[in-house]
Structures are given as structure tokens and as C-alpha cells.
Amino acid sequence: YYHYESTADPVVDILKAANELSEILDYKFDGNVFLAGYSEGGYATMAGHKMMEESATNGFNLIASAPASGGYDIKGMQEYFFSRESYHQPYYLGYVALSYKQVYNATNILTDIFQEPYSTDLPDLFDGSLSGSQINDNLTDVMADLLQADILANINTDPKYDYLNEAFAINSLNEFVPTRKMIMYHGTADITVPYQNSVDTYNSMIDLGASPNILSFVPLEDATHDSGVVPYIIDVIETFDALK
């Protein structure tokens, strides 16, 4: 979860699998690819786009992608969470922490970030039997009660947290400069994955040299994380149809 390689690899792999299946079914696939996704799917879309540009993906022609409402700047997401008195989806924080614990063998990550009993309880809460809302019911949405006071105060200054900041940087996508068309979307009233994260990511990409003719941004006016889904789908279908 919010790990670049394990997110981007399956995007490319499923395209390869679909291409092989099309040959088996005698379906003519022209190789043109459009990528779209929302929330974590937005991150996956941008990650897949990046990997397709930077790796050999013979047989595929990426026409455009449309990542929506993802947390592309992971350090920015951490700063957003830490700045809030409360956050209504605390299981997201546990999800990222457990992912990085597994990928990086970060044995202290749960106790570094979370207070008890949450640091002990989190692995069992993510055993696959509970929904996100059910996990939330076993956590607190008050950040000062969920998170360790030390990390809230010192994540940017104490070297013990360097491994976290390095992981955030490695897996963030805000320094990617796309050369194939990308249309970003985000709801302006989104407080689940903050709108500003997409704005900052877009501005970073432009500052680093992305062409406004390649990279564009569509604000979904007054849309929350939930209410932005339908207008995004409607617009992206029309946009992709025009690019075919």
C-alpha cells in the first residue's frame, strides 16, 4: 500500500496478461493503453504510468492516464495527518505502516509511530477479516492519542526516523516528469486524501519541466473523496474517447 514497485509492477503485468489472453482468444489488440484509477487507484495509475515510461513495455503504447484523488506525495500525506487534531480514516495510517514493515523489514515501525494498544493490535486488525470501517472502530481518530508524541514532534529532526522519511521519498511520485499525456483529477472538498496533495504534486511536476500540454489538472468542484467518483468517471470516459 503506497509502495511504488509493488503497485506499479501489477499494472504492467496485467497489461501483459491481457495481451496474451487477446492472442489466445484471437482478439485484435492494437497496443494502445489508457490508465485510470481513483484514490489508491489514482496512485496506482500514476505509478503504472511512470513505470511504463521508464521501463521497456514492448507492444504497448501509453496514450494517456488519468490518476484521481491519490496521495502521490507521501511525505505531504504524513504532514497532513500529523497536522490534524483528528482524522476520520485512521486505518490508512496503519495500512501504510504495515506495508512498509513488510517491505523494508522495519521491525520498530509500529512502536515508533503508534501508541499502545494500537501498535500491538494493528497486525491482527489487518488479518483480512475486517473492513476499513471495522478497523477504524478499533482505533481512535484523535491523532494525539493514536500516534507517539515523539514522532509527532521530531519526525523531521531525529535521525531515528530517517528510514521513514526515506521510504516516503522513494515511493512518492511528485518528482516524476511525464512525457505521455496525464490528466490529474481531485475533488476540491476532499479531506480524506487532501486536494492540496494533488495540487502540490502537479505544481512540482510542472516546476521540474513537465509540459502543460502533456500534464493537466481538473479540479472536481466541491467534491469530497466519496462524491468525486462519479463525476470523475463521467469526465474521464469522455476525455479518453476524444483521444482515441
What is each model feature region?
Residues 1-6, 36-40, 155, 224-227:
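Alpha-helix capping and helix-loop boundary segments enriched in small/acidic/polar residues
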Residues 48, 180-182, 194-206:
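Short alpha-helix in the alpha/beta-hydrolase fold that links the catalytic acid
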Residues 2-24:
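Alpha/beta-hydrolase active-site loop
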Residues 74, 188-194:
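Acidic catalytic loop of the alpha/beta-hydrolase fold
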Residues 79, 160, 165-167, 192, ...:
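C-terminal catalytic histidine-bearing segment of alpha/beta-hydrolase fold enzymes
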Residues 68-175:
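Accessory cap/linker subdomain of secreted extracellular hydrolases
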Residues 16-88:
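Primarily recognizes the serine-hydrolase "nucleophile elbow" in alpha/beta-hydrolase
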